[in-house]
Amino acid sequence: MLGRRSVSLLRGLTELPVSSRAHTALRALSVPQTRRNVATKPNYEGHIPLNWFENALLTAGAAYMSITDPRRGDMVAALGETTAGPTVSWLRDQMLASPEGRQILKDRPRITSSTVDMDKLAQMPEGTFGRAYINWLERCGVTPDTREPVHYIDDPELAYVMQRYRECHDFYHCICNMPVNVESELAVKYFEFANLGLPMAGLAALFGPLRLNAQKRNWLFTEAVPWALKCGSSARSLITVYWEKRWEEQVEDMKKEFGIWDGPEARWSKPLNEAKEAAERRSKTTQNQIY
């Protein structure tokens, strides 16, 4: 059983931001710094090395918070990293086996509003992937700038693979025509688990439905899950897709190439607020260009 100090630490774990927690609470319970292995030095910017006990404690705390409060994106991200295990290496190997994937690992592109020309995508013809992505962002009210950076994967290349998965998640929603409400998010998690095999996606798919009412749970298991498992398992591994090179391609052509088809009709909720200002800025920019 955990001692009193460990219980206190676990309580603090659920209340502090990830970076703050890792530098304070987790360190307090670890082996004295003088006895720690030199391998605990950061391997890349933002890396937070953990020993086995810190990793286990973070996993337990992040799992608890991810279930009780799925809005804690930092905890969901931390759990994804601490449970990734050999799956991330397997995904890296898939990328290395693909010309497109190898180019991604060589270039290491990032997907944010500062690296992607959103104004250019908004001016692309309807039916192109770039225009579909912008339409999806605005319809859902989200931005690509809310993804947590990777902290707890030691190998820099594997850390990038996890970051790549994280930043491409919205593309999966977009190409599968899925919104971001809870039941649709879970459908995409089932798809990701079948397609990529990440344990975190499986955990979310397992425990997430507990938060749904009967009607939404029925839609998930009778319509969405069968589609997600069949489509995800038969489609090309999406971690190998260089999405940024495909903005001008037709979405329907990409679906055929990847072996993807639309999921069941989903419930589109009111857009979230995080992308409202971004959409307004793009609108003003377009008007200025016209006048």
Swiss-Prot record:
Binding site for Zn(2+): H169, D170, H173, E185
Localization, UniProt: Mitochondrion inner membrane
GO biological process: ubiquinone biosynthetic process
Pathway terms, separated by semicolons: Cofactor biosynthesis; ubiquinone biosynthesis
Xref: InterPro entries: Coq4, Coq4_euk
Enzyme category, top tier: lyase
The name this protein goes by in its record: Ubiquinone biosynthesis protein COQ4, mitochondrial
Organism: Coprinopsis cinerea (strain Okayama-7 / 130 / ATCC MYA-4618 / FGSC 9003)
Lineage: Eukaryota, Fungi, Dikarya, Basidiomycota, Agaricomycotina
